[in-house]
Amino acid sequence: MPESRGAADQMQIPDLPQPVPTTTEPDDATGNESLGVGAEKSFRPYDPNQILLLSPNLAEWLPAGHLGRLISELVDNVLDLSWIYASYRELRGAPPYEPRLLLKLLLYGYASGIFSSRRLERAAQELVPCRYLTADQQPDHKTISEFRRRHLKALNELFGQVLQVCQKAGLVKLGHVALDGTKIKANASKHKAMSYGRMKERETEYEKIVQGWLEQAEAIDQAEDEEFGKDRRGDELPEELQRAESRLRKLREAKAELEKEAQEQGREAPADKEQRNFSDPESRIMVNGEKAFVQAYNCQLAVDDTPHHVVLAAEVGNQASDNPQLLPMLIRTALNAGEVPDRISADAGYSRETNLIVLDKLGIDAYIAVDKDQHSRQEPSPRGRIRKSAGPRERMRRKTRTKKGRAVYKRRKHVAEPPFGFIKQGLGFRQFLLRGLEKVSGEWKLVTLAYNLRRLHDSGRWRSALAIA
């Protein structure tokens, strides 16, 4: 008789899960070894050491509509570079780089926010667009910097040529033009500036220091002559004396410039608070948009009222006031674009009475704020006819308070400010690299030329414009 089984003996024992064996066999899907977490997933093949077969044609490295292609086509087939080529002569030694190569590199760099010669040197080595534009040649930073310095005036002339291409592309209307200015830092510290009053004090101090060193040097010379004989060269000036004489010379030069400027303005002498900077004497201390005092230049733009915001003229001054810039900007706009704009608008910084009189004589429909807070006040539109005895400022004040005047002036802000925002924020241009008003003016035109290139490229119309050109 079989033995009876207990309840425990009758229970079914489930199969236990078997551990997944680890393996280092390649994954069929990826060809990669399993690496623990995530190893069961499939990824695209990745091998940094894989040999690539790149096209030997550098032109195939860039997409069809790339900015680099626009710049290459523009430099090769449109721009007149005769001024640049005329400066080269047949000399012995290694031949220089092709000017088109360096020009393309500069234009692409400035249009991409790369301004310094050292960064441009690295870009020519590392960035595909720059290697395409330079045909895979790598000029050093000294060559790039010297090319920019040597041909700065010729580069300025290219601004007008690029503007003409923008006109042919239909990006310019020249109906309403807005003027505006901004303060951009000079390549100099405001702490290197000194007032005229302080210069007079320091001049006396340095004169005493120099005289003391000269007397000490003379005494040493006499003592050494008695001991060693009169066989010294006599040009072994102490380092402290050389430094003091150098500072005294620079101080006198800056002081003389202030005095000359005062005489040209019909004044006997400069005010004690007037300053000069020793690093860049032509720059001035100005108040920027953040209400901070900076060593800067006053940079001006004339912007066309279209969705493309093309810059028609770009100038630089070293006076904080915008008033002296209005007429030069108007003339430059007419020269660059080939005609005078129908209408202009500007803020209160340009409202000098002589400016308003000239604009009226030229028949230009101008809308210029007369008071700084004029358009922040809620005032009713004027009624009735204006008095015959009203002066230019009163007439302009009344004109800009009309319904049409308010609309035009409100439009000004949306026309003039975007280029400054793109140049400062988009390109990152906030300080000049060069020094001196002439060089800074050239650098500003190069920056705005590059800005217009970006507008031309972004419009998508550059191919047809280059074909017409």
Q: Where are these predicted regions, by residue range?
A:
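Positively charged, structured surface patches that bind polyanionic biopolymers
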Residues: 35-69, 90
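Anion-binding and metal-coordination hotspots
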Residues: 1-28, 34-35, 39, 45, ...
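Short arginine-rich
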Residues: 131-135
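Basic, short loop/linker segments at the boundary and entry of helix-turn-helix/winged-helix-like folds
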Residues: 62-107, 112
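Generic detector of low-complexity/intrinsically disordered segments
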Residues: 18, 54-55, 60, 64, ...
